[in-house]
Amino acid sequence: MGFSDATDIACTPDGRYALVTSSGTDRIAVVDIEKLLSLIQRLPQYERQHVLPNHLGYPTEFVVKHIPTGKNPRAILIMPDNQRAFVTNTLDDTLGIIDLAKMEMTGTVDLGGPKAITKQRWGEQLFHNAFVTFHRQYSCNSCHPDGHVDGMTYDIESDGIGIQPVDNRTLRGILDTAPFKWEGTNPSLSRQCGARLAVFFTRLAPFTPEQLAAVDYYVTTIPRPPNRFRPLGATLTPAQRRGKEIFDRTTANDGRTIPLLNRCATCHFPPYYTDRKRHDVGTKMSFDRTGNFDVPHLNNIYDSAPYLHNGMAATLEEIWTVYNPDDRHGATNDMTKDQLNDLVEFLKTL
């Protein structure tokens, strides 16, 4: 069985054990530190670096026990007397008490959270649990921590060749931004997270209709955090105002009219800054099935790098300085460096 979403670790004062929480499988792994160090020392350097971190069999040599917990265990604290440890069971609002002599859960403390399991709460619990994946290897939260992104690209095609990477997209604020998937072929979250999920991700039976409805509902409630580049109610800085003018412009620096589809605001207009359509912006790679990709929303775009459908742009600047040679992703090649900097400053405020 997998050990998804390892979240926190604490070592006993005597240095004998390390306790690691798995928020995706509702367990704590008890690691015998001496056995782990012995394994590391006897392995050749190559295996230490390249095999041990990914070998699913090695943990049997140093994980001596798994302790069941409440839902979604995260933080863990070991008391200085080496007698007890406490773990936060985040999604059932309890504090678990562990007897370190027995390495067992001996009690819980109710933290007074809501007792009714609403549709949103149930969806949140399902989102954070790896029960739906083969061997419980990962949860929805594994790739979308806090409903956001892990900064990775994935090849999720079933051929297993690894030649069609796609950028992981945020789930924050995606209500009313359908369609989904970079190719824009899923018209709803139910389509995105339903049977398709079982085929390409979980390799098990899909969510039941009731579970799927709860997960979908929870995803639509994941909020965007406050924008750190533009506090609520704040006016734009001079650079941000200049960037907005670039974003909204209809003429290039030489006075020529910019074609409608080459204007930023044509495809990215408020409030979500997406027209919810597919466009070819010149980023198609040789193994891509299509060059038409879904227009992502731009809200809080500053913290969702990398960019473009396959994550090839490491920064916002690279979208236009490296991957827009023919002005197919907006008319930008006439811009000065200062203008591009201002545009990026404005984009960070969205």
Where are these regions (language model features)?
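Periplasmic c-type cytochrome electron-transfer domains
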Residues: 1-350
